[in-house]
């Protein structure tokens, strides 16, 4: 393990890079912006080897994720507040289609009145969209939970929302233990080239009910 001083948003970017994500559609919104800025820099520096796609809106970003997930790619995006509200319709589609993806959300209040302070209303309003929601309480938890989320989404066939407080965690520096790439690779094997999906019997309800069990199982494996 390598010790680093990271913000919550930097921890997300490091975890995405370590997870060998293949497609990242990106659109900035405060306080999430430095997630995609860090990934853009990692792409420019040759650290991130996946596709980094700059899009014109949060809605388009999630639409890209849906298309990439249909093709079997490991995919990720990030947003906050009104950006998450904007993609509400597509959240239902991603979950209903049983697509594997991870979305990081830096909690921020919804207007009106206009406010950029931390508030969980944005993610709580998406409770019934069918996404697994994982909430973080420290920068270390953010990095660990993003890694966990990619395993949970792959095994449960449901998209995962990783949630953390805007500014209080997204912009605060904390000491973080970053695992080596080889250790992450052993925990997150590549996705199969031909994902198995039983089209005639999606079992959406079973998948959602099984997701909490899968999350606990993956957490135990993560700590092993």
Which functions belong to the PLM regions below?
Residues 25, 99, 158-160, 204:
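Structural beta-strand/beta-sheet cores of well-ordered domains, especially the beta-sheet scaffolds
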Residues 160-224:
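Conformationally flexible catalytic loops at phosphate/diphosphate-handling active centers
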Residues 8, 27, 31, 141, ...:
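Short, contiguous, pocket-lining structural segments
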Residues 1-125, 130, 139, 147, ...:
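Thiamine diphosphate
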Residues 132-135, 140-178:
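Conserved anion/nucleotide-ligand pocket segment
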């Amino acid at each position: 393990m390598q010790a680093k001083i990271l913000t919550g948003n930097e921890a997300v970017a490091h975890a995405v890079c370590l997870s060998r994500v293949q497609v990242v559609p990106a659109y900035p919104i405060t306080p999430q912006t430095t997630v995609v800025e860090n990934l853009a820099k990692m792409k420019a520096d040759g650290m991130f080897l996946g596709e980094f796609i700059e899009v014109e809106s949060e809605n388009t970003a999630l639409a890209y994720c849906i298309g990439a997930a249909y093709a079997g790619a490991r995919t990720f995006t990030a947003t906050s507040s009104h950006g998450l509200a904007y993609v509400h319709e597509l959240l239902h589609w991603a979950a209903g289609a049983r697509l594997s993806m991870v979305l990081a959300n830096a909690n921020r209040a919804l207007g009106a009145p206009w406010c950029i302070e931390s508030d969980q209303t944005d993610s709580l309003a998406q409770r019934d969209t069918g996404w697994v929601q994982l909430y973080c309480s420290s920068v270390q938890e953010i990095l660990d939970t993003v890694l966990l989320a990619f395993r949970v989404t792959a095994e449960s066939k449901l998209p995962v929302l990783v949630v953390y407080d805007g500014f209080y965690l997204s912009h605060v520096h904390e000491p973080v233990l970053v695992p080596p790439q080889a250790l992450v690779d052993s925990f997150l094997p590549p996705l199969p080239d031909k994902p198995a999906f039983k089209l005639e019997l999606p079992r959406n309800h079973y998948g959602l009910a099984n997701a909490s069990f899968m999350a606990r199982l993956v957490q135990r494996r993560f700590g092993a």
